[in-house]
Amino acid sequence: MSGKYRGALNPVHEATYQFMGKLLQEVKDVFPDQLVHLGGDEVNFACWKNDAEITQFMEKQGYDYYAKLQTYYIQRIIKIVESLGKESAVWEDVAAKGQEGSVPKDTVIQVWRPRTWAQKMAQVTRHGLRTILSGCWYLDLISYGEDWPSYYRCDPHAFNGTKAQKDLVLGGEACLWGEFVDWTNLLPRLWPRASVIAERLWSSEDTPDMEDASVRLGEHRCRMVRRGIPAQPLHPSACPFLPV
């Protein structure tokens, strides 16, 4: 792309897929992980809308909206990943309503929208797709007061679905985006709130008692502070044997 519209790759050029094949080969060579995350969220279609070649391609293919073009692109990229013996993960945008069948069954869908995650988890698992939840756990978002209880209460299985659907939930992942986070505030923004999410995801279902968790996580926060980690308070409190 040239001009002021930059960002998305051109999905109608074969050179795009040649480049991505080489890039993903490097990813395979460097990282042993089986799962490769391909992204796919919040794609800005402005550059595609202003490219005559793309418009002509869409007309030829019968694509009436740009999400279909994105589906075409991601399908080809997933095939490259498969040829390398890896599996793909994508953001929920790729499996938009009506497009769930556009990705292979072994694709992992990461659900990120906070307000609609339960509906989306039900939707993608109904189509037999595995999923990871992030919609509850955005650590870059801050609020006044105690925000950790909402992280702790979130249950990735709390959506309308069968046992078979809920068996497709692999777990969850906390996200911390960097628009307003850098080295000056990363650690206090991250800790101990990430510990709250870790306990929720790695504990049995019968460990949801908030009062016990509050005491336990408060102690853990003090443990981190004693070790030199600038973990922010979870609630009004003071760590013993520390300056106040």
Where do the language-model regions lie?
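Active-site neighborhood of glycoside hydrolase catalytic domains
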Residues: M1-V108, W112-L129
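Flexible, acidic glycine-rich loops studded with aromatic residues
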Residues: S88-A96, E100-V244
